[in-house]
Amino acid sequence: MAPWLRERMNRVCRALGVQRMLYGWRRADGAWLPHTRIHGATQVVASASLDIADHVYVGPFNLLDASGGLHIAEGVQVTSHCALLTHSSHHALRRAGRSYWGAANPPGFVRQPTHVGAYTFIGPHSVLAPGSRVGRGVLVRAFSYVSGDVPDHAIVAGQPARVIGDTRDIDGPWLAQHPECRADYENWTLAR
């Protein structure tokens, strides 16, 4: 199917709230990403500020808040019921009360870009706070709250999320059994 037709069908499906996986995404710079899949039940806020690579999977019932700049690298998987946030008003609203409404820049309002590195997995019901920088090859376990920096290849869990392991420890034995995958694995783990 032609990319323009796929894109038009995806827009109609999103507008109608169609509950299915939609294949292909047109980035704000015009690039067509044929292998990126974003479920129709996922809400994308400020898509013009979404910097997303190809080969990304975003499952159902997620919130991708790109209003402050959301960067999702190649091969990222976002499962379901996750929030990738780039702004937060909860402190500002609580502190300012009614004076929050209409204020140009209310105290406590946060807007920061969030980055998710290549081949990272984000488990169900996880939240990435505004300004988070999640490295490459990270495994974010279910129900985690991530804030701040997460190093490459970390396994993180909890609220707040803490490093509990390294994905290379579980990848090594598997790669020993599947040597045909080692070259591709090393290409993305070593690339910058």
Where are these regions (language model features)?
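Terminal amphipathic alpha-helical/low-complexity segments used for targeting or macromolecular assembly
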Residues: M1-H35, G75, C82, S88-R94, ...
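Short helix N-cap motif at coil->helix boundaries in the Bergerat
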Residues: G148
